[in-house]
Amino acid sequence: QRNQRLALLVLLLLLVVTGVVILMVRKGQKQEESAETFQETNDHTNYGPEEWMSQGAPYIDVQLLTPNEYSRPQLPLNGADYIAIHYTANPGATAQNNRDYFENLSISHEAKVSSHFVVGLEGEVIQCIPTSEMSYATNSRNVDSISIECCHKDDTGVFEQETYDSVVKLAAWLCARFGLTSEQVIRHYDVTGKECPKYYVDHPDAWEQM
């Protein structure tokens, strides 16, 4: 009887171990499938500005940065859980100026900073980094957020109407694309307490309206 009980216990233990292994394998497969789905969603091979516009996006000028450790490290985004809105803090600079600054960091090495998109003073939108990759913009949320830098004319940080309209349209399109809600559109301020985007930190009602 002891031998039978021992054999039964061993059998039960083997069944439990087998069950745990199967669950772990299935979990790993689901994670891989999820990652593959996210990468497919972000694959720019079969998509472009015209396709995106048909889906509700503003025109996006794709000027991807040269891979480098200071502005485009090519680290994978864990997932798009947030859309983070920033202001450039350099009044009068254009979207192209800011994009070129990010690009030049590969040479100057003065900082690690970048953004997925930059929206200009006239509403133009430049994409600097694929949405499947991480940007250096939102501190602890770099790993799971898509960042939008916004140009502004003066120190108040208020967006021009053209800039505002493009930001709203771009954020709405990204929300639709990644299944997000307006609650997942955040300010840099909401992550770190930094006064960014300045006008929309100083005027919470304007942020809520946006």
Segments predicted by a language model, with ranges:
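N-terminal catalytic cores of peptidoglycan-degrading enzymes
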Residues: 2-139
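Basic/polar, cationic surfaces and motifs that engage anionic cell-wall
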Residues: 4-8, 24-59, 154-210
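Second-shell loop/turn segments in exported
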Residues: 71-72, 114, 150-161
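Soluble periplasmic/extracytoplasmic beta-strand elements of cell-envelope proteins
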Residues: 84, 147-149, 186
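Cell-envelope and extracellular/periplasmic
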Residues: 89, 141, 149-155
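A conserved beta-turn-beta hairpin within the catalytic core of GNAT-like acetyltransferases
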Residues: 144
